[in-house]
């Protein structure tokens, strides 16, 4: 019984290892294609290569269209128009999340 429990726990830990490593940034990368083998437990898509490490997105990232004003006010308005709560506007990228129900 103890052996089977240890084997089960070992398999469980091994199967979640890649997603844990992706969330904590232990997997190094140069492009987004280096992170394809990792699976993210988030609804915001697959892992992305950010600053040389694979990370799972936990907030939705929206890029403003090219024809918009690049000010913070335009960024906030664009994200609010999508029905999201604005978290931050940095370098023409809008970080937002869905409001709680």
Swiss-Prot record:
Signal peptide range: 1-22
GO MF term set: metal ion binding
Entry keyword Secreted: yes
GO biological process: defense response to fungus; killing of cells of another organism
Subcellular location: Secreted
The UniProt record lists the keyword Disulfide bond: yes
Coiled coil: none
GO cellular component: extracellular region
Disulfide bonds listed in the record: 29-49, 35-54, 40-56
Main location: secreted
Any Pfam family hit: Nodulin_late
Keywords, alphabetical: Antimicrobial, Disulfide bond, Fungicide, Plant defense, Secreted, Signal
Family of the protein in this entry: Belongs to the DEFL family.
Name listed for the protein in its UniProt record: Putative defensin-like protein 307
Organism of this sequence: Arabidopsis thaliana
């Amino acid at each position: 019984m103890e052996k089977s429990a240890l084997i089960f726990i070992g398999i469980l830990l091994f199967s979640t290892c890649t997603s844990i490593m992706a969330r904590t940034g232990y997997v190094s990368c140069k492009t987004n294609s280096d992170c394809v083998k990792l699976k993210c437990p988030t609804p915001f898509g697959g892992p992305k290569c950010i600053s040389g490490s694979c990370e799972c997105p936990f907030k939705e990232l929206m890029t403003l269209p090219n024809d918009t004003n690049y000010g913070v006010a335009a960024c906030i308005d664009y994200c609010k128009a999508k029905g999201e709560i604005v978290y931050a506007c940095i370098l023409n990228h809008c970080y937002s999340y869905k409001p709680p129900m």
